[in-house]
Every structure is written in C-alpha cells, then in structure tokens.
C-alpha cells in the first residue's frame, strides 16, 4: 500500500475509534484519546472525567472495550490506559458534551451559553469561544456565538495551543451543533512579552566560563594598537596596489610595438653645405628678376 493511502487509512481508523469511544463513554465524560502503535501492540490513552465508570466493576467494562477494539478495528493487542481529567471545565470535548446535554434538557440556549463560558473563564482559561449553529429557537437555522478573553483562529497557535471540541444536541426541530474553543491558562502565545522595571542588568548577564566582564576586556587589544594595525594594513595595501600598477604599465609598454629611430639611422648633414645651397638659389632668383627689369627698360627706350 502506498504511503498516501496508508496515511488516509490510519486517519480514518483513528476517527472511527474516537466516535466509538464517544458513544460508549458519553456518560463517563469522555475527553479525547491518544493512539500510538508500538512493537508490543497498540497503546491507547483515554481521558475521562469519571475513570471509574470507564473501567467498570472489576474491570468488566474495560475488558469489553478492549475486545470490541480487536473485533471491529483489527487492532493487534490493544492496551487501554485511562487517565482522569484534572480540570473538566478546561477540556473542550467535555464542555461541548455538557452544553449539548443542557440544550437537550430544555435549557434556553443563551442562558446555557453564558453559564458555560463563565465557568470556563473562572477555571483560569485565557480565552474561550462557543458557537451554536442550527435551529436554535425557530424553524430557521442561525448561528449564535459567545466569546470571552482572547482566542486564536488561524496559524500554528490555533492548531497547537487551542483546544477544540464538538458536540451535537438532538432537538425536536432538528440538531444543534456545538463547537467549543479554549486556550488553557499555561499557554504561551507567540505575541506574549513581559516588561521588567527597575531591574539590575548584571543579574541577567550570562556567565562565560566563569570569567567576569573585566577579565574579558583585558584580553581585548587597546584602541591605539588596533589603529596602528589598521594603518599598517592600509600601507601594505597601498604598496600592493602600486606594484600592481607598475606591472600593468610594463605589460602595456611591452605590448605596444613602437619603432624609435636610432642615432645610426640619422644621416650626418653639413650645415655649411646647406647654407651654400640656399645662397645659390637666392642668387639665381635675383639675377632672373634683374634680367626681367633690364628687358622692360630696353623696351620702353625703343618706344620713345
């Protein structure tokens, strides 16, 4: 059988056993059960307001219940342990059954609801809620709620902290569902906090291997030493950065291939020869201009 199917079968069997106990032990104040399967058999812990009625005279009733569990639910060697409920008014299952019985006996629903929730709060509960749904007073179905204190309705606290119980009152006009939620007195809610006034902080300081605060402070370095170490670290980091920059520049110079002319490649040029060449070019230009002027003057003389 697959794990999912086995999980469903175990939950269904647990619900059927719970309904069986509720029918058989209703007058004894049945308050719930815990089932645990062990190698030695199935361990069942019953919670009841009147354990004597569950056990019976000479254990007759408990033997009958054990035989019924083996036959109806195929449990291997069931071992039933009965525990008495310390405070019945804080058990949601017992309170729901009591309220349902009161409604069946003819109590007015509002009186029964207020009386029940007042008893719950007087027992020390942090909060309680009672919901009656069905044909409470007339032919039409409706819902009536009674609240006291603080009750969580969702999240993990609603599943782990809040105690829930359900009962059914069979009336002439129809059934009335009874749902009860109770937060016990010792519940630790996630939003609880305490404020201490005029408290010495040293009383709440945790000891570290028996060492005092002064001994712990002696082992710590002074501020001046710490500052010097920081300066040394900064200087070392700056040197490392400069070396890294130099290496990077050298790599760039090596990568770039630049041709630089050397002294051997440059030809030796005589300055005097350059000056003579310039003078010769100037003399030739001057002579050419002089000849042009003489020709123009001769042409003007001939015209006259």
UniProtKB/Swiss-Prot annotation:
CDD domains in UniProt = KH-II_30S_S3_arch
Quote the NCBIfam families the UniProt record gives.
PRK04191.1, uS3_euk_arch
PANTHER family documented for this protein: 30S/40S RIBOSOMAL PROTEIN S3, SMALL RIBOSOMAL SUBUNIT PROTEIN US3
Cellular component terms per the entry's GO annotation: cytosolic small ribosomal subunit
Every KH type-2 domain range = 17-86
HAMAP family noted in UniProt: Ribosomal_uS3_A
Region Disordered: start-end pairs: 216-304
UniProt lists the family membership as follows: Belongs to the universal ribosomal protein uS3 family.
Protein name (database record): Small ribosomal subunit protein uS3
């Amino acid at each position: 059988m697959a794990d999912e199917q086995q999980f469903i079968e175990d939950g269904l069997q647990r619900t059927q056993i719970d309904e069986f106990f509720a029918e058989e032990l209703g007058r004894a104040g049945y308050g719930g059960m815990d089932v645990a399967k062990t190698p030695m058999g199935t361990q069942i812990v019953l919670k009841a307001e009147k354990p004597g009625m569950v056990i019976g005279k000479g254990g007759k009733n408990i033997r009958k219940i054990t035989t019924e569990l083996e036959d109806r639910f195929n449990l291997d060697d069931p071992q039933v342990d009965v525990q008495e409920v310390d405070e019945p008014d804080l058990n949601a299952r017992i309170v729901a059954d009591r309220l349902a019985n009161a409604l069946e006996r003819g109590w007015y629903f509002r009186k029964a609801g207020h009386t029940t929730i007042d008893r719950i709060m007087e027992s020390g509960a942090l909060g309680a809620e009672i919901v009656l749904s069905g044909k409470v007073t007339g032919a039409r179905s409706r819902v009536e709620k009674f609240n006291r204190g603080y009750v969580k309705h969702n999240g993990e606290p609603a599943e782990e902290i809040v105690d829930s119980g359900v009962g059914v009152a069979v009336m002439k006009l129809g059934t009335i569902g009874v749902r009860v939620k109770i937060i016990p007195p010792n519940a630790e809610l996630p939003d609880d906090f305490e404020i201490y006034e005029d408290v010495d902080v040293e009383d709440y300081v945790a000891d570290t291997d028996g060492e005092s605060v002064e001994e712990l402070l002696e082992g710590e370095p002074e501020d001046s030493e710490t500052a010097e170490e920081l300066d040394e670290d900064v200087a070392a980091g700056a040197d490392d950065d400069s070396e890294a920059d130099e290496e990077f520049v050298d790599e760039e110079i090596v990568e770039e291939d630049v041709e630089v002319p050397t002294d051997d490649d440059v030809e030796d040029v005589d300055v005097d020869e350059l000056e003579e060449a310039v003078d010769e070019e100037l003399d030739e230009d001057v002579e050419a201009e002089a000849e042009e002027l003489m020709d123009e003057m001769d042409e003007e003389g001939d015209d006259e």
